């Protein structure tokens, strides 16, 4: 099941919860309807990384830099800057071979219809895009008319967490 939970345990990942600092999230997720295996995207990139491929290493260094700048833009509510950073992130991922035709179609539609930024979400090569928009309902209408299967609006949630057992509710012992 989900690799995102694994990120919290990865020694090389930096995961920060920002939901308490950002009053609203002007994003929408648009699903292309394309099913795929993330392994088909990640495996070749991982192999290239391990072989020391300069293009892949430079690409991921750039993605890391863009993420740090994006965090600052997000926390500052600078949506135009965040949109430009999302577009730059997508260009790097696309150039590394991570995007697919369905992703590109929805991203193009989003950007042509008022989105400040749009990029693939997840592994790429189909699946889902995320768009930064100040007019989500209008963009949803355009994306659905353009072949999008489903639109979702992300919102901060607590997510999965571990809780201490209730000391009052001790497990029963076998008879």
Named regions from a protein language model:
Residues 1-119, 130-175:
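C-terminal nucleotide
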Residues 126:
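Glycine-rich active-site/cofactor-binding loop and its immediate structural neighborhood
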């Amino acid at each position: 099941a989900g690799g995102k939970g694994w990120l919290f345990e990865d020694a090389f990942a930096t995961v920060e919860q920002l939901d308490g600092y950002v009053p609203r999230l002007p994003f929408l997720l648009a699903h292309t309807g394309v099913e795929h295996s993330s392994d088909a995207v990640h495996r070749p990139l991982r192999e290239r990384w391990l072989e020391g491929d300069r293009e892949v290493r430079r690409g991921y260094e750039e993605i890391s830099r863009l993420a740090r700048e994006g965090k600052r833009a997000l926390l500052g509510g600078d949506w135009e800057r965040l949109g430009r950073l999302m577009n730059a992130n997508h260009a790097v991922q696309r150039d590394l071979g991570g995007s697919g035709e369905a992703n590109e179609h929805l991203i193009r539609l989003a950007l042509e219809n008022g989105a400040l930024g749009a990029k693939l979400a997840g592994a790429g090569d189909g699946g889902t895009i995320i768009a930064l928009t100040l007019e989500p309902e209008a963009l949803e209408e355009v994306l659905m008319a353009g072949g999008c299967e489903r639109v979702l609006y992300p919102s901060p949630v607590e997510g999965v967490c571990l809780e201490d057992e209730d000391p009052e509710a001790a497990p029963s012992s076998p008879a």
